[in-house]
Amino acid sequence: MSLEVRRTAEREIQRYHAKTGLSITALLKYAGIPHRTWREWARRRGAETKHNNNIPKSYHLTPEEVKAIIAYCVNNSLKGYRMQCWEMVDRNVAFVSCSSVYNVIKHHNLDKKWVEVKEAAKQGFEQPTAVHEQWHIDFSYIKIQNSFYYFIGILDGYSRKLLNWRLCKNMEGINAEILVAETKEMYPQAAGPRLISDNGSQFISKNFEELLALLEFSHTFTSANHPQSNGKLERFHRTLKTEHVRRSSYLEYQDACIRLAEWIAYYNSERLHSAIWYLTPNDVFYGRTAVRLAERKEKLHTAYIKRQEYWRTRNAVS
């Protein structure tokens, strides 16, 4: 309300008070003006009304933070805003919440629509509570030039770390047996993990079952025609093909092995995973979860304090 309008309202209230003898309180109630507003008008009588709508609050992002977020999101537009957020925190680009990142990219039309994935009715197996409790194994096709090869990997169900893998020229059972034996040698501390596989001929063979018995593994088969039962590894295969295979053009088999190894190293040690608090599989696998989350919390708190000081200084000057 402008000063002129406020003065007019005050004069009218005083005029009716003098003319009718009604109390100021009654006239204010009739006019719909709260008594606290009248007292505030009296306190600021003669002073122009100042609105603070345009004064940035202490929790607002600074211009430098907004610029950093925009620049990072433009260069990483294929990733979701939550992954972008925690990558920026981990890489010391900007220390803001996921909702703040979303608001910035939404305001600057940098967001993209995602297909909503409906949750399956079945929730699958009981989830592991530590590493090496559940291992997942499966094959997937990869095309190199004009030939198909077969990627087989073992994924730790708790950390989502790909423990071991091979790129095979066929789907014979010996490839699965070698991979399981190699992985057990790599991680001797794994005491009888539960191996989850589909009902492929490689996994139901007598030789494969004898190997698992020798290694003291338990074996669980997924439901027929229900790949979601092995969903963690199926999701890894999807990520592998979406983020790497379909963007690459392998020259030949050896070239594919080298580049797959590089991407898998990136997946395990750098790529943030939405199912494990947007940490890397190695963070969870090696027990760094609490430390990494605490580091992020400290960064966000420090940035919040600096942001408050920034706006306090700016608002004091203006």
Per-region residue spans from a language model:
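Residue-centric detector for conserved, function-critical "anchor" positions
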Residues: M1-I33, A42-N52, A68, N75
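Generic alpha-helical secondary structure signal
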Residues: R36-T37, N207-E210, L214, G231, ...
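Basic, flexible linker segments flanking DNA-binding modules
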Residues: R39-Q134, Y286-V291
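C-terminal domain-tail junction helix/linker
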Residues: P56, A213-L215, T239-S318
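Mobile-element integrase/transposase regions
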Residues: V89, A94-F95, S99-L155, K161, ...
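Acidic/histidine-rich, metal-coordinating catalytic segments
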Residues: Q189-S205, N225, W277-N282
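RNase H-like polynucleotidyl transferase catalytic core
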Residues: G192-N199, A213-K232, S248-Y253
